[in-house]
Amino acid sequence: MNNNIHFVDIGFSNYVDAGKILTVNRPDSSPIKRSLQHAKEAGRFLDLTQGKKTRSIITQSSNTGLIFTASAVQTSTIMNRIRETEVKQSKRMAGKLIEKSVEVGNQ
């Protein structure tokens, strides 16, 4: 697996690539509703709510344009999970740097 891909749980064991997330929005604003309608018409909408109330809309970049994903998880919860993923990644990278510096020092 590519080391640059970090997945975030957006509910019901559904994961998205944290590196491709552009925005996490509430679904109740008019601009988001319009964007969702256009995304549905263009086949760029994923409903991952499992029939539950949509509590957040995740906008992601892809090679072919934007993808909108509906989640039943609150926006603040998703943002916290993204932050946790970033912290874990930073710690992992720091650990690798320390290992490399120890290897260089032992040579």
UniProtKB/Swiss-Prot annotation:
Keyword Cell wall biogenesis/degradation: no
Keyword Ribosomal protein appears in the UniProt entry: no
Taxonomy, superkingdom: Bacteria
Keyword set, alphabetical order: Plasmid
Signal peptide: none
InterPro entries for the chain: RemA-like
Homology family: Belongs to the RemA family.
Protein name: Putative regulatory protein BCG9842_A0044
